[in-house]
Amino acid sequence: MEEIRSARGRYTLYGTSACHLCELAQEMLQQLAQVAPGFVYSAVDISDSEELFQRYGLRIPVLTDQRGRELDWPFTPDQLWAFYRS
């Protein structure tokens, strides 16, 4: 997994390539990146890891930060912004 940093730390979006909700979450993250300079994230396909699949399989998409906080779907742009700002 490629490590990416922002001014507020590292973010990871867990999902799968066949997940429509994950695509919606990625669109929201891309919109956030346009208004929050320095915000970047990495997307991880949980189907590549049994451990990640067991942890996130029924909850994807899930966004995590370097502090271990998790934002589960469904989330709104406002909730995403609040997660980023806190």
Residue ranges and their predicted role:
Residues 53-55:
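Short glycine-biased active-site loop of nucleotidyltransferases that positions the nucleotide triphosphate
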Residues 24, 51, 76:
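Residue-level recognition of oxygen-bearing side chains
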Residues 57-63:
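Structural micro-motif
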Residues 2-35:
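Local sequence-structure signature of Cys/Sec-based thiol-disulfide redox active-site neighborhoods
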Residues 65-86:
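Non-catalytic, surface beta->alpha helical segment in thiol-disulfide oxidoreductase systems
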Residues 38-50:
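Thiol-based oxidoreductase modules, predominantly thioredoxin-like and allied folds used
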